[in-house]
């Protein structure tokens, strides 16, 4: 093994000098022992004269010039396979759940190529989530990618936890949850939620939390993806959840600044599109198995044109947009049915009936949106009878789009509801056709299927 020595330490950036004829490759893992602690560095740049610039995959506290560094001769490798299920790991694949070591038969490099074109496989099979607004307005497809876009505090993590809970119980495959730069408290809550739902034995958890150095947060998404790729290549249908893809971008911006690159628009790294592409192109389905990915995307200052969410948009099949305005009305999940889109909302994929009902719902809500200004100025009494009916049905639809969640039971006191796709379509179809025009709109708030509106107090 080649050895070198540290010549400079600036925060998370460490420069290491090696003999000029055996300089480590970019992305190689280096190991430095500091007392009892071992720290992994990842080579990011070769500066010439045998010097490489590295990012520390951990706290660089205590490092000093002159310490010996060993080149491991390969990129960071993490355990993969069934031994990772029900375990919590860090960016290096080390267990952080105090349940002992992970006895994996294989370790894979976190830097891998995307599958070749001839290996790819497309699926048109709809993935039922049990959440009405998603299943109707922005359906997800098996092997597709969906993004949950929203500002701070509108419910991205709660929606993601509900999706994991519903799909993991209904769907027999494995799930990988990757916490990228999120709160430790949320990671802890998520673990206990999965344990209480009895789905922990089908989930691998990989965390790189908010308090960790930028190198950990930047690479942890690749660690989770590598574990998911192994399950896919074994022939499984895998669910990959990433919370939050914005923190991945932010960690990349921190690393870029530390490496001395010139920032681009709004202070992001100049390599933003490339880094996003490297991650997203690997999240795909092959003829062996599928990876279905659901990613939470924080939207800074609720601005969807910010480079970070805007770069993510182009990689997704479905965009689920969470709205602060809808959350302020007390309608949860606060998903905007007019802003949210899906490539699968096509009669050839979802069927003509589903497509017609979704378009009917969109049409009524869009008309209600247009009438709001008139109502605010002149009052609802000045509207024509047809428009009054549109407003009445739109308000019922708006309330029927709300739904009690299983993962929020402890906060709301309402039992969670799973609504099948067929029940969702027939419920909205009945509202559009005027079957429930005689019922007050309050009856449609926070219920599961449409039948509950008849019995609700």
From Swiss-Prot:
It catalyses: ATP + H2O + 4 H(+)(in) = ADP + phosphate + 5 H(+)(out). It is a peripheral membrane protein. It is an enzyme of class 7 (translocase). ATP binds at residues 150-157. It is found in: Cell membrane. Its EC number is 7.1.2.2. SUPFAM superfamilies: C-terminal domain of alpha and beta subunits of F1 ATP synthase, N-terminal domain of alpha and beta subunits of F1 ATP synthase, P-loop containing nucleoside triphosphate hydrolases. The keyword Nucleotide-binding applies. Signal peptide: none annotated. Keywords: ATP synthesis, ATP-binding, Cell membrane, CF(1), Hydrogen ion transport, Ion transport, Membrane, Nucleotide-binding, Translocase, Transport. The keyword Ribosomal protein does not apply. Pfam families: ATP-synt_ab, ATP-synt_ab_N, ATP-synt_VA_C. Produces ATP from ADP in the presence of a proton gradient across the membrane. The catalytic sites are hosted primarily by the beta subunits. Belongs to the ATPase alpha/beta chains family. F-type ATPases have 2 components, CF(1) - the catalytic core - and CF(0) - the membrane proton channel. CF(1) has five subunits: alpha(3), beta(3), gamma(1), delta(1), epsilon(1). CF(0) has three main subunits: a(1), b(2) and c(9-12). The alpha and beta chains form an alternating ring which encloses part of the gamma chain. CF(1) is attached to CF(0) by a central stalk formed by the gamma and epsilon chains, while a peripheral stalk is formed by the delta and b chains. This is ATP synthase subunit beta. It comes from Baumannia cicadellinicola subsp. Homalodisca coagulata.
